[in-house]
């Protein structure tokens, strides 16, 4: 009775949630002062539990901030230490457990947190939980209820907690909004305490024992859950696994200077590949050497930096026509960069997304770690590298190049065991080359901007008729093709869909032309290049873009790149400054819709200068292709039918409008 009656004079709140959910910022908002460390970071900001309090309207409010207590990558010792500290700070009771979730970022980690709360605090705790959503500002004009309805796992979680939730904007500068959201939360807490007949009583011994059981269970099942890299990798290194194939083919990949050749020599147990420190790449071509290991033939293929090669597929096929059993990405500890990611992108472009299932990461220069723990270093150093390790299911090894004798042999054996295990898990199959798909580039825009000349520049030959005329030169869609950097490229030149002279006489011509445009595209990914003339953005350009959106859908710009012709008119200026300083709102709006993707052509260029600007465009297209999940504008039969319906409805509307204007005149 005394505990319940004191709830009017004191409220104790426990913040729970995954890393970066906004717990600390929420705690600061509740207390009305900055007491918990809060900043955006890819690593955990809060390392230990912290208790702070403040008197708000004659009521003491106690807030306990916590690190991510239920993270699947945290070690068991840290979990146990933090949960014990949390329980000590929470005693004797809590008026509410606040589960903090960031709007738009509900993930499996949040579900793990909810499950962890029940495991540690027991089923009774569910009756005392309130969900606090953060990042209210990200909702914009949308309703929180609508957002919850659209996310089934989140909707189920809200139902599990009987619809108890509120939302915070921790970025607001409005004092009224700050106090309003805090008071709303505290009213919900008071109501919850009254409904439950009192607060949640913390039994340190019971909860601590329950958590220890949870830790023990996790430790016994670490093969089924994502643990730290070392724990995860140990389960697949046993030498007694099914021997499977009698040969292992390993392709060494990595940026220039990563130490691929030295790694190959360590695996082979002899100096087979040339090594040396040089500003230039020591390995200029693919080289293959082999050794016998546990009655298997192990072929090691040393490769130059494949991100700089034009025809990687033909080069690799000379040595392994079917593809390798394993990719070994060699990268020095502490030096994982964008150059490594360029190598991965090249592999993905040639082998597809599945190549991650065939990759192991070899970290060299382990000797530079000194006394540091490798797992700790990986967790706390490079986010991109750690993410890659997780994507590869924690398959990695580390080499100490100062190792000799038995130690050198041991680290080579451990790596080969991992490779053997991975190959066995992949059914002893090779990672086969990705089926080459054509890249379709559709040139669109008003007439007179230089679409045909741009098409000829991309193709490197005079395929499309291009000359200065008062009337549109291109009457119908046509295509040309070339091979660029081993990639088949089809360029489709189109008429201006809003300036077709014969459409007025025969409205069906527009429908026919859209069909023809799409039929020129071959099997593969399709992207648009919106062509404008530098310094001459007109009302016709605006109309042309509006027409394209009406035909291909409002989101077609997601698959589009802006291209300005007459680059020579820039003189000593650059395109970035031109766009930045443009006072044309319509042009800037299109630029934003196209994701700020833009380039410029001088269609009078020839030779290497012409190829340089073509490379710049196709690089942007392939970057966009990668961003869009290796898929372009959908021209499936279903989508084509939808487009034709759009065209028919648009033609009918234009016809009615024309008749109406005629009547009014």
UniProtKB/Swiss-Prot annotation:
The UniProt entry lists the main location of this chain as endoplasmic reticulum
Give the span(s) annotated as Disordered.
217-246
Q: Which GO terms describe its molecular function?
A: GTP binding
Q: Which residues form the signal peptide?
A: none
**Cellular compartment(s):** Endoplasmic reticulum; Golgi apparatus; Mitochondrion; Cytoplasm, Cytosol
Instruction: Output the Pfam families linked to this UniProt entry.
Output: AIG1
Taking every annotated instance into account, which residue ranges of this chain make up the domain AIG1-type G? 8-210, 245-435, 436-644
Residues annotated as region G3?
65-68
Tell me the residue numbers annotated for binding GTP.
17-25, 38, 135-137, 170
Q: Which InterPro entries match?
A: G_AIG1, GIMA/IAN/Toc, P-loop_NTPase
Q: Where is this region: G2?
A: 44-48
Q: Which residues form a coiled coil?
A: 400-427, 608-657
What protein family is recorded? Belongs to the TRAFAC class TrmE-Era-EngA-EngB-Septin-like GTPase superfamily. AIG1/Toc34/Toc159-like paraseptin GTPase family. IAN subfamily.
Q: What name appears for this protein in its UniProt entry?
A: GTPase IMAP family member 8
Top-down, what is the taxonomic lineage of the species of origin?
Eukaryota, Metazoa, Chordata, Craniata, Vertebrata
